[in-house]
């Protein structure tokens, strides 16, 4: 997309043609510099971003979301989760497993999840996430280093797949 096309149709999603400003993404990374870069870059691309550096805070957010025991269906506020794999105390894989447990207990589907990972962690993640080679289509892997333009395209694609 050229600069002129961006000016004529700001925040247009090439995948669906919809405005991406309606898409809300939770970004989780313990490295505050990377978190800030991702937040600024993705917001600059038109996404609404909630950024967290502490995975335990993220768990609290999801406990609140999935703890809604009213008659009304749970409204998931996030279209996608972007989670770093390597975090101290609670890594991205463990965080994802906890979020999926909370969702299962609430009888809802969690949002799609994209992991940010260094290439050498790839097979370790696959082994931990997909035991017995049972693939989870709601999870994608994004390799470092990250280029915001490529990341934006990938996230729009992942969101479109799950709409």
Range-by-range predicted roles:
Residues 1-26, 32-39, 63-77, 106-109, ...:
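Non-catalytic signal-transmission and effector/linker regions of two-component phosphorelay proteins
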Residues 28-29, 52, 81:
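Conserved sequence signature across two-component system core domains
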Residues 35, 88, 121:
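The feature encodes the CheY-like receiver
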Residues 51, 89-90:
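Residue-level signal for the "D+5" position in two-component response regulator receiver
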Residues 52-65:
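Conserved Asp/Asn-Gly motif in the active-site loop of CheY-like receiver
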Residues 84:
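Active-site residues of response regulator receiver
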Residues 114-117:
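Hydrophobic/aromatic residues positioned on beta-strands within the core alpha/beta folds
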């Amino acid at each position: 997309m050229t600069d002129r096309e961006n000016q004529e149709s700001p925040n247009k999603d090439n995948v669906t043609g919809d405005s991406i400003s309606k898409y809300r993404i939770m970004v989780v990374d313990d490295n505050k510099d990377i978190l800030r870069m991702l937040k600024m870059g993705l917001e600059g691309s038109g996404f609404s971003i909630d950024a967290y550096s502490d995975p335990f805070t993220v768990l609290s957010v999801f406990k609140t979301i999935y703890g809604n025991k009213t008659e009304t269906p749970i409204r998931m506020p996030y279209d996608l989760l972007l989670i770093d794999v390597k975090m101290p105390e609670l890594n991205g894989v463990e965080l994802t497993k906890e979020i999926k447990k909370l969702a299962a207990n609430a009888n809802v589907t969690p949002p799609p999840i994209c992991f940010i990972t260094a290439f050498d962690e790839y097979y370790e993640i696959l082994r931990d996430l997909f035991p017995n080679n049972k693939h989870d289509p709601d999870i994608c892997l994004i390799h470092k280093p990250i280029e915001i333009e490529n990341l934006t395209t990938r996230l729009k694609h992942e969101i479109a797949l799950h709409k």
